[in-house]
């Protein structure tokens, strides 16, 4: 039985980053992963391939519509979907090979197979051929990620009724794509196929899109997506979906009750969220339990069992790759005897549509519920010079600060390239910056980031460019 300082079950963003940091700190480490490639859902069938398609589809729509023509670029593009998928796959392959290189560089053993616990300090790995290998470790990190949440009454066959993985590799552009769920996954993948020519209808049980985000930014995003042609049926639920060789027949009902309606689609994407993947881990062998969703109840990263840690989507908090990465670093450094904590109040979230939505910290709704006094500064991209000359003026920046101390409590952005701007406020808020600190900090001109400074100025009504 081979022995390690740390054995990590799962090779996604949490698992592979934990393995790399363990190697950097001089720990002997093995990462158990049953996929043929490292990177987990995010790299293989999630974050990265979806961004590749979002980028390509955005350029295609710009070239085939009025956007390029308005700039004096007159072209008539032809969609080569097979090539678009090929470049997406090539990008993903390059990234997975990069992780393999980092494993070799940091002396991480990749044990190929599916891991399960076998009591404290032991992991059994089952390879594809059925053979099993036992590993021993001082510390075990569970980083098995998540899987798409199924919808009762709707059977995902990945032929006509698909999950997010299926939506990344459709063989043709659907005439009509129905998306069940108006969260990150549904809106991003719905945007891809709408840009490529699909009619897209989004069905959401709640009366709003982007649950959990700032209401005002979500409404602005919905308005922008609707203007682009995306159809929303909010406050609705799918009670039946029947697939055939050439499409899907759906039955919808109002969430609050009422008259049902029928809907036809070429494909249906079920994107109602994700749930922790803890099947087959044999958690009971170490005395760990999960809740109804399969989530490990213990707060991350240490569990109630000495020597067993849990990070990423299998535990509480947002199911985001960067949250898993932060937990990975904190977990391994604590194993190595170094103090390290994750600031769960400052985990940013992004929706990579056009316009983009980005958020960090508290929303107005949360602060009202807490009874905390606050002030708000907003600045529209219509008043930002770079946004105007680039003809991307939808959206705004919103900064929320404490009414007395002026400390920034939350930042909510909807607009062009805001995914690349939210990090500024993550840093600022980590150091308890005030809105005035941001307002007094020079920003380059002309950039979209100036909208952030102007919003911070406007917390006290002092924006200069509106």
From Swiss-Prot:
Pfam families: Pyr_redox_2, Pyr_redox_dim. The active site is at 445 (proton acceptor). The active site is a redox-active disulfide bond. Keywords: Cytoplasm, Disulfide bond, FAD, Flavoprotein, NAD, Oxidoreductase, Redox-active center. It catalyses: N(6)-[(R)-dihydrolipoyl]-L-lysyl-[protein] + NAD(+) = N(6)-[(R)-lipoyl]-L-lysyl-[protein] + NADH + H(+). Its cofactor is FAD. LPD-3 may substitute for lipoamide dehydrogenase of the 2-oxoglutarate dehydrogenase and pyruvate multienzyme complexes when the latter is inactive or missing. Disulfide bonds join 42-47. The gene is lpd3. This is Dihydrolipoyl dehydrogenase 3. It is found in: Cytoplasm. FAD binds at residues 33-42, 51, 115, 313, 321. Belongs to the class-I pyridine nucleotide-disulfide oxidoreductase family. NAD(+) binds at residues 181-185, 204, 238, 271-274. InterPro entries: Class-I_Pyr_Nuc-Dis_Oxidored, FAD/NAD-bd_sf, FAD/NAD-binding_dom, FAD/NAD-linked_Rdtase_dimer_sf, Lipoamide_DH, Pyr_nuc-diS_OxRdtase, Pyr_nucl-diS_OxRdtase_dimer, Pyr_OxRdtase_I_AS. Its EC number is 1.8.1.4. One of its GO terms (molecular function) is dihydrolipoyl dehydrogenase (NADH) activity. GO terms for biological process: 2-oxoglutarate metabolic process. NCBIfam families: lipoamide_DH (TIGR01350). It is an enzyme of class 1 (oxidoreductase). GO terms for cellular component: cytoplasm. Binds 1 FAD per subunit. Homodimer.
């Amino acid at each position: 039985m081979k022995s390690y300082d740390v054995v990590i079950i799962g090779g996604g963003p949490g698992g592979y980053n934990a393995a790399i940091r363990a190697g950097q700190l001089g720990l002997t480490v093995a990462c158990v992963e049953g996929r043929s490639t490292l990177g987990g859902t995010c790299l293989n069938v999630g974050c990265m391939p979806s961004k590749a398609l979002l980028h390509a589809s955005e350029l295609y729509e710009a070239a085939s519509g009025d956007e390029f023509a308005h700039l004096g670029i007159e072209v008539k593009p032809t969609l080569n979907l097979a090539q678009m998928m090929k470049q997406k796959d090539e990008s993903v392959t390059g990234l997975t090979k990069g992780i393999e290189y980092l494993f070799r560089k940091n002396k991480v053993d990749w044990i190929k197979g599916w891991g399960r616990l076998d009591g404290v300090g032991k992991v059994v790995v089952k390879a594809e051929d059925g053979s099993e290998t036992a590993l021993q470790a001082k510390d075990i990190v569970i980083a098995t990620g998540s899987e798409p949440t199924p919808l009762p009454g709707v059977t995902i066959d990945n032929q006509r009724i698909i999950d997010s993985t299926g939506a990344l590799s459709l063989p043709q552009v659907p005439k009509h794509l129905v998306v069940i769920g108006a969260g990150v996954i549904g809106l991003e993948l719905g945007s891809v196929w709408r840009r490529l020519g699909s009619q897209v209808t989004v069905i959401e049980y709640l009366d709003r899109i982007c649950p959990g985000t700032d209401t005002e930014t979500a409404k602005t995003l919905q308005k922008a997506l609707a203007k682009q042609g995306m159809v929303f049926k909010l406050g609705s639920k799918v009670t039946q979906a029947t697939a055939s060789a050439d499409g899907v027949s759906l039955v919808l009902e109002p969430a609050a009750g009422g008259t049902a309606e029928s809907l036809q689609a070429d494909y249906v994407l079920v994107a109602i969220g994700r749930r922790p993947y803890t099947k087959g881990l044999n958690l009971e062998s170490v005395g760990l339990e999960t809740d109804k969703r399969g989530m490990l109840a213990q707060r991350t990263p240490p569990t109630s069992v000495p020597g067993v840690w849990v990070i990423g989507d299998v535990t509480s908090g947002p199911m985001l790759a960067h949250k898993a990465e932060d937990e990975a670093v904190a977990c391994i450094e604590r194993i190595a005897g170094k103090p390290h904590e994750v600031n769960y109040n400052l985990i940013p979230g992004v929706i990579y549509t056009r316009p983009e939505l980005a958020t960090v910290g508290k929303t107005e709704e949360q602060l009202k519920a807490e009874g905390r006094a606050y002030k708000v500064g907003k600045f529209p991209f219509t008043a930002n010079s770079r946004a105007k000359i680039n003809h991307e003026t939808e959206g705004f920046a919103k900064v929320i600060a404490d009414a007395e101390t002026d400390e920034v409590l939350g930042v909510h952005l909807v607009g062009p390239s805001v995914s690349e701007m939210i990090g500024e406020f993550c840093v600022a808020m980590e150091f308890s910056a005030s809105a005035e600190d941001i307002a007094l900090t020079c920003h380059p001109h002309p950039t979209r980031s100036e909208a952030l400074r102007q919003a911070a100025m406007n917390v006290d009504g002092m924006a200069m460019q509106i």
